[in-house]
Amino acid sequence: MSLIDWFAARRKDQFVGKVSQDTDEGDGLWVKCSECSQVAYRKDLISNFNVCSNCNHHNRINSDERINIVADKDSFKEFDSSLSPTDPLGFKDRRSYADRIKDSQTSTGLRDGVITGFCSVNSMPLALAVMDFRFMGGSMGSVVGEKITRIIERATKKNYPILIVCASGGARMQEGMLSLMQMAKISGALKKHKEKNLLYMPLLTHPTTGGVTASFAMLGDLILAEPKALIGFAGRRVIEQTLREKLPDNFQTAEYLLEHGFVDVIVKRRELKTTLTKILKIHGVNELVEANI
């Protein structure tokens, strides 16, 4: 091997071999966009809110990153952090549900797939729930449903607006009917919140599907979505096989739902806090909170 070939091999090992396909995987210096295949310096991607500067693809981010984008610095106060799922049905497919819970808790550092709490957005109060797709696909089980219900009830008592960041594959099948009941429970809590004329906003991120879409994700006074997010109930193939029709290429995207009136506004990630600030000011959030003191 010539000296030039040796240097070329070394260079390939140092750079090409460390390109990651996902911002959540590995610790390489470079990340390859799953949408346009553009290779970006990881630190540049993170500083751009994990959005590809070439094609504007919004990569998945975790719950902590979401909170940092929305909440004022050091303003987030978490509730119900000790709640953890159990296995009431003794469910087992290829692996037991209990083992899946442990694996997800170990890999994510979370107890379940949502973080809830109060925060401020440019000094205006907000009740915040952030689903995390890393934990069993963001599926909604009894703990996720209970935590979201509790934060809604707390917000109702204090006249706080609510933002729920949705990222979910739907109801958690390992909990059967217990997971399905969370749809009704959360919807009931939102109805009481609405009866006080308080603001509720879901933010639909990629993906938002199944029982989450069929319940609280579509009950907002103002429904926000991230660009190109997959939003739907059943999967595309299931619908095509049932209807025996070819669906449009952009079917179940945020843009398609905006065009057909199911989404009110598409918000780029870097503009989210500014958009929320405008909405909260228009709704006179501080005045509502003061009236409840």
UniProtKB/Swiss-Prot annotation:
Pfam families: Carboxyl_trans (PF01039), Zn_ribbon_ACC (PF17848)
Annotated EC: 2.1.3.15
Pathway(s) the chain acts in: Lipid metabolism; malonyl-CoA biosynthesis; malonyl-CoA from acetyl-CoA: step 1/1
PROSITE patterns: COA_CT_NTER
Binding annotation for Zn(2+): C33, C36, C52, C55
Predominant place of localization: cytoplasm
Function: Component of the acetyl coenzyme A carboxylase (ACC) complex. Biotin carboxylase (BC) catalyzes the carboxylation of biotin on its carrier protein (BCCP) and then the CO(2) group is transferred by the transcarboxylase to acetyl-CoA to form malonyl-CoA.
Family according to the record: Belongs to the AccD/PCCB family.
Alphabetized NCBIfam families for the sequence: accD (TIGR00515)
Subunit architecture: Acetyl-CoA carboxylase is a heterohexamer composed of biotin carboxyl carrier protein (AccB), biotin carboxylase (AccC) and two subunits each of ACCase subunit alpha (AccA) and ACCase subunit beta (AccD).
Protein name: Acetyl-coenzyme A carboxylase carboxyl transferase subunit beta
Organism from which the protein derives: Prochlorococcus marinus (strain MIT 9215)
